[in-house]
Amino acid sequence: MSSTDAEAKNEEAVDWEGPDDPENPRNWNQGAKMTHVLLVSSFTLYSNLAAVMFAPGAQDLVAEFGITSTIVASLTVSIYILGYVFGPFLLASMSEIYGRLIIYHICNAVYIAFTIGCALSTDTAMFLVFRFICGCAASAPMAIGGGTIADLHKPEERGKAMALFGLGPLLGPVIGPVVGGFVTQFLGWRWTFWLVLILAGVVSLLALVLMRETFEPVLLTRKAAELRKSTGNYRLQARTYNKDLTPAQLLARATIRPTKMLLMSPIVFLLSVYCAFMFGLTYLLFTTFPAVFEETYGFAADVSGLAYLGLGVGMIISIGLFAVLSDKLLHQPHGGTIARPELRLILMIWSSPLVPIGFFWYGWSAKYEVHWIVPILGTSVIGLGAFLILMPAQLYLVDAFGTEAAASALAANTVLRSLFGAVLPLAGPSLYDSLGLGWGNSLLAFIGLAFAPVPFFFYKYGERLRVRFPVNS
């Protein structure tokens, strides 16, 4: 290509009007950015609340619908999480073609409609189908929320935003059973869905009014279309436009990308497996709470859900630590070089031993029936460690793979995490029946310790591996 052709091509490429263009989402005022982060965080909160808020009422539904199979009874709760396995691949890829906003709005509408369906269900099949579709729709903010944060914030500004984004997936399962227990006792299991519906409806209406598109390629494409119309120059195209691929080919490529990243990138695969194991452990831990706190410590059924708050306290502490330290670590001078994404893993390296320590603490104190506050303190350590593993890993994926592939990287992470969250708890009863609380939790702790070197390995070799295994295309 000649220099003249190159200049002509540059003149026809539509871009932002300089680094300070107010239309660029990264240049929006802090109020607008925070509004979007809070709304996306609210999406994840109510979608994760719904995952387990119904659990205390599951036995009432089983009795009402005459369910006799233990597998089907378990599915009434876990099929929602299975929706998280199937939804992200399609939703993340569509967000990278059509933008984030339309995906949020469509999925919110679907979620609301099928939550009403769950509340009004009259038989098992109807309930399971509606709840699965709810799970698929609820996976949208989990899959593309990190992409929205990457659209809005430069890498060195993402720590606080990701801390807020991480509230939902981790605090939802903690608060859900507490609220669900009281709602089921006083209002019935159907009201767990009506309550989520009210919350989802309010947040969705606010999103319709306040949210705007944030994805750069979509915004530049719209800008180019307006300029073509106003100038009559039909050669104008967005800087991000790919003339070699049709929309169908772009969608196919974006749909394949999460799978490609999971299978071909050791970074995405190993970090996703590690996160999935940590996420699955927290759900598996929940299966022990009724036996430990109701049978061993004599908690009444209506207050046994308060035992979940130990995890919540640990997570709240970790949110503060993450928000304060994550971006500071990225700002530290490192030999005069530009901060690399691997610096996000420092918090993860420090925190890796905490979850195993928490499981040792919880398991053996519960086995020997030490005062009930002691195992709850152990779960606080688990909550602290789990958040400081999951959030640095997600933020690292966002920073390492950029705005255009962040949603795909997080979709791959969400799929594995949700799969482990749905399946691993099923192993809980047989594990603890065979080994007891002490050695059963110790086995999980030893597996957690085996994963501890993973973040250090990627801290040291991640940059080299990203070059060796490129998956952004």
Curated annotation (Swiss-Prot):
It comes from the Eukaryota. Residues 1-27 are annotated as: Disordered. Coiled coil: none annotated. PROSITE patterns: MFS. GO terms for cellular component: plasma membrane. It is a multi-pass membrane protein. Keywords: Cell membrane, Membrane, Transmembrane, Transmembrane helix, Transport. Residues 1-12 have a biased composition (Basic and acidic residues). The chain crosses the membrane at residues 37-57, 71-91, 101-121, 125-145, 163-183, 191-211, 266-286, 305-325, 345-365, 372-392, 409-429. Residues 13-22 have a biased composition (Acidic residues). InterPro entries: MFS, MFS_dom, MFS_trans_sf. One of its GO terms (molecular function) is transmembrane transporter activity. It is found in: Cell membrane. Efflux pump that might be required for efficient secretion of pyrrolocin or other secondary metabolies produced by the pyrrolocin gene cluster. Belongs to the major facilitator superfamily. This is MFS transporter prlG. It comes from Fungal sp. (strain NRRL 50135).
